[in-house]
Amino acid sequence: LRALGYQVTYVRNITDIDDKIIRRAHENHETIGALTARFIQAMNEDADRLGVLRPDHEPRATEHIGEIVAMIGSLMAKDYAYQAGNGDVYYSVSRFKGYGKLSGKHLDELRVGARVEMDESKREPLDFVLWKAAKPDEPSWDSPWGKGRPGWHIECSAMSTHCLGEHFDIHGGGMDLQFPHHENEIAQSEAATGQTFVNIWMHNGFVRVADEKMSKSLGNFFTVREVLARYRPEEIRYFILASHYRSPLSYSEENLQLARSELTRFYTALRGLPSMGEEKGVKGEGLGVRSNTSPLTPYASRFFSAMDDDFNTREAIAVLFDMVREINSHKSHEDIAKAAPLAAQLRKLAGIIGLLQGDPEAYLQGTADRFTAVVHVATGALVGGGANLKGTAEKVINVEEMIAQRNAAREAKNWAESDRIRDLLKANRIILEDGAHGTTWRRE
């Protein structure tokens, strides 16, 4: 959106008080504030590593009790809410005529299923809690209905309205939040303000493992941090963007390896070409970002068309691959004058979705310093001096030194030794590429 010139205010609210948080804090013998602060910090650290932009505002529910109480008060005054005999305050779902318009569900059908778990304190089985009466050993705040704490749904409405106003453009969240959470947000927000709550809802699909939804209860749950221990942040980001955000995301080692392989193709195409602005004629203007002064290039037009189609990053990446094919064609004919501007445009477009901003050499070699890069070799023979690596002991070799020794063997026309070094490195997932300007290497 920012690449299109829109001014974006990004809000990510945080529920820092609910039943699970209270229970976990008790189990850990720590304060709720300490528990939530620790998890919020970990979340932001992981998001930063994945290149997720920080929000402009990150409100926490406990910091907006005043706004929450005020919104509940408005609903009470308009007869959309009531206080039950147990002290809880509930939203009266039947009072809101548009209930179900987001999810397509109908009240009569919902009532049939809801009666099984009917709470005696409610007037109707679908009514949901806005304010929970205080319980012993739980945090609580003052309100016109007595001490208590907010329900989950009202927190989100109050915080988003506080930060963005009574009406805003885009609301996101997981597919599982569409009903009842987002349906309830619409009901309480529109009843309180009289305004349409949101223009566009964007619901992302679940992460699935072996065709099952990832969840703690199924035992197939893992954290971003655990995956980051095995894959680079850009590889994980690419893996996510290679699927449409509304589609299920199928997690597997095979799919992450595919993401690594495809990023390798991109960075191999960019390798040896100047970064944007490093060469005369390769500047920032006209590279494909929409503006009022320069027309879109054909590739940029296709890229933006894909992104305009419900944020179709999968199709946008397909456009970037078409650019790679043309870049490689120009490189094969040593036509750098054509390859370099196209590579600059590729970086510019990919940068819109947070990809291909790294150094190609660093990515392909898996290290920021190609001259000190090493590889662990378990079997085979080291070049030079007859050093033997046979056995189980793991040794470390310098890739650049081995390339130098291979070059010496080639100059001496010792092709057997040259091939042996190449094969040894290949066995350890190091691929050598001989070109007009010497030998380069990358990790397989």
What positions do the PLM features span?
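Structural preference for alpha-helix termini/caps and helix-kink/transition segments
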Residues: K213, T223-K283, G288-E444
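The substrate-binding groove and active-site-proximal loops of carbohydrate-active enzymes
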Residues: A25-I32, D56-T62, G174
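Alpha-helical recognition segments enriched in aromatics with Gly/Pro capping
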Residues: L1-L4, T9, E45, G66-S275
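Short alpha-helical functional segments enriched in proximate histidine and acidic residues
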Residues: D46-R49, M71-S74, K78, Y82, ...
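Hydrophobic face of alpha-helices
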Residues: G33-T36, I40, S157, I317, ...
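N-terminal, positively charged nucleic-acid-binding surface of large information/translation enzymes
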Residues: L1-G51, H437, W441
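Short, glycine/charge-rich beta-strand/loop segments that flank catalytic centers
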Residues: V11-D19, I40-M43, L53-I68, N86-R95
